[in-house]
């Protein structure tokens, strides 16, 4: 189902599920990347299992493998924008704007004081995110404060996948001299509707303590 339109409409108006407690993502401090593989976590028990996460970080021979970034700084996810045509003119009926879709969101952040080798391995992930124009084979999980992970439940509501990302780019290093950090700017894109089925789960361990095996 599109986030914009459900066709045909229901026989009557549906309800709006109440949110009993506010859900704040707070700060994203690390990211976990993997190839598209919706069934890497078999169920809710596996998803909150420290052993399951560590096993996926240490797998080297299949597409269920995960990799975790160093700490990231300043990560922001802008709200997507509505794409419209016309409005208040003769190009549309009664001058009503036509809604054509939802635009992409460009996620930006920085990684401080990493080696050239680490930056290059992140760039290899970028290759997975732009196999050809408009095609990606990589997803991302967001690791938040309070030991939480944000993931994609998908339309079925029972998956534990990451969010599809496109065009992951790591720039050249930036340095402003004495008593400053060396910085890499990083960004990727997510298509309109990316967050329709997001889930938020506090894990019984600190996922930001996880690390990749030695290369």
Q: What name fits each language-model region?
A:
Residues 1-3, 51, 130, 183, ...:
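Detector for methionine-enriched segments
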Residues 29-32, 70-72, 121-130, 168, ...:
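Generic hydrophobic, helix-prone segments enriched in Leu/Val/Ile
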Residues 158-215:
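Mixed-charge, glycine-accented linear interaction segment located at domain edges/termini
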Residues 2-110, 163-180:
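Solvent-exposed edge beta-strands and adjacent loop segments
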Residues 83-158:
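Structured, beta-strand-rich domain cores
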């Amino acid at each position: 189902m599109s986030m914009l339109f459900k066709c045909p409409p229901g026989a009557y108006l549906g309800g709006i599920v109440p949110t009993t407690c506010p859900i704040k993502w707070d700060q994203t401090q690390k990211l976990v990347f993997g190839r598209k593989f919706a069934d890497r976590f078999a169920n809710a028990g596996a998803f909150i299992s420290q052993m399951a996460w560590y096993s996926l970080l240490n797998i080297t021979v299949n597409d269920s493998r995960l990799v975790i970034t160093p700490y990231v700084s300043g990560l922001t996810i802008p709200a997507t924008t509505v794409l419209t045509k016309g409005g208040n003119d003769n190009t549309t009926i009664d001058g009503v704007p036509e809604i054509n879709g939802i635009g992409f969101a460009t996620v930006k952040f920085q990684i401080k004081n990493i080696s050239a080798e680490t930056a290059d391995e992140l760039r290899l992930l970028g290759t997975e995110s732009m196999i050809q124009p408009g095609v990606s084979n990589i997803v991302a999980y967001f690791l938040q404060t309070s030991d939480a992970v944000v993931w994609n439940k998908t339309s079925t509501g029972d998956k534990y996948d990451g969010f599809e990302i496109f065009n992951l780019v790591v720039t050249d290093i930036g340095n402003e001299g004495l008593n400053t950090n060396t910085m890499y700017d990083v960004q990727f894109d997510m298509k309109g509707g990316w967050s329709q089925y997001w889930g938020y789960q506090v894990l019984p361990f600190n996922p930001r303590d996880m690390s990749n095996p030695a290369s």
